[in-house]
Regions:
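Short amphipathic alpha-helix with an adjacent loop that forms part of the alpha/beta core around
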Residues: 142-151, 174
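Conserved beta-strand signature within the Rossmann-like core of class I S-adenosyl-L-methionine
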Residues: 180-195
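A short, conserved alpha-helix within the catalytic core of class I
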Residues: 165-176
Length: 288
């Protein structure tokens, strides 16, 4: 929806969000802003902070088999990224889960529609054990296959981080949200919607699964109200509306780039997220 970004290497970002210059391993890398490191930091701290709860699902108990624990990404990208303002190469978000050793996920499900990214993911995860499942194709069309890979009785988390607003449909979120234990971390592209509000109507409706937003969003300044509508939509699946958290991620000018929305059906999960949100990636006091 928005104009392609330019990075320090010159040239616009590719339509799939990748940098024009490959990584040092010769494979594609996603081109991201420096604020991506903030998102990764929150996710990394969350994965670490939930290891005690997750470990209970990784071992048999009371004669019952282990429930398991899955990490899911609907828009996994190529597995590595480059900060467009500095050229720094960083691991993609899938590797936050892959490399976590405290209470390792029993299943890692990565969905990606771009063929070049799928090929890069396959190569970058080739030496790993059999935990990783890569689903090639549009996550909206392959969601049943994705859900089939997730432990039904496990403690699971899904990162929903689309490149822009267009690729995601609420029906896809609904399939994940209907699972008994599924924490959601959703990238909500607030600034992108503000910049393109006049032509983003169809995208917003598909993302939120409702037309109600048209009654409350009349100008770009109203876009933040969309977050509340998404919260109310998730409430239908057991995520208490007042407990669905939204964390604004800002750029260097202090403008909000996007909201990182966290939803859980578990009281402990909210407590953990609130603790994490109190401190930013730079060690500053956060919102709570």
């Amino acid at each position: 929806m928005s104009k392609p970004d330019r990075c320090v290497f010159g040239g616009p970002t590719k339509p799939n969000g990748n940098c024009t210059v490959a990584g040092d391993d010769g494979l594609p890398v996603q081109c991201v802003g420096p604020w991506a490191k903030d998102k990764h930091d929150y996710l990394r701290r969350y994965v670490e902070a939930t290891k005690a709860a997750r470990s209970k699902f990784l071992t048999p108990s009371g004669g019952r088999p282990a429930g398991g624990a899955a990490y899911v990404e609907l828009f996994a990208g190529p597995g590595r990224a480059r900060i467009r303002t500095s050229g720094e190469l960083i691991p993609g978000s899938p590797f936050i889960a892959i490399e976590h050793a405290g209470a390792p996920f029993s299943r890692i499900v990565l969905a990606e529609r771009d063929k070049a990214n799928v090929a890069a993911l396959l190569k970058r995860t080739d030496a790993l054990d059999g935990r990783v499942r890569i689903v090639s194709g549009d996550c909206n069309e392959r969601i049943d296959e994705i859900v089939a890979q997730i432990p039904e009785h496990g403690l699971n988390i899904a990162l929903v981080d689309p490149y822009g607003l267009g690729p995601l449909r609420f029906q896809t979120l609904r399939k994940l949200a209907s699972m008994k234990r599924m924490d959601l971390v959703i990238h909500f592209p607030t600034m992108d919607i503000k910049r393109n509000l006049g032509r983003a109507g169809g995208f917003i409706t598909r993302f939120l699964g409702t037309e109600r937003w048209r009654d409350v969003v009349k100008k770009p300044e109203d876009v933040v109200k969309l977050v509340e509508i998404l919260r109310s939509q998730l409430a239908a699946f057991g995520y208490e509306q007042e407990k669905v958290r939204d964390l604004p991620i800002k750029q260097s000018t202090n403008a909000v780039m996007y909201h990182l929305i966290y939803a859980t059906k578990d009281r402990l999960g909210n407590k953990i997220w609130d603790t994490i949100a109190r401190t930013t990636a730079q060690g500053q006091r956060g919102l709570f």
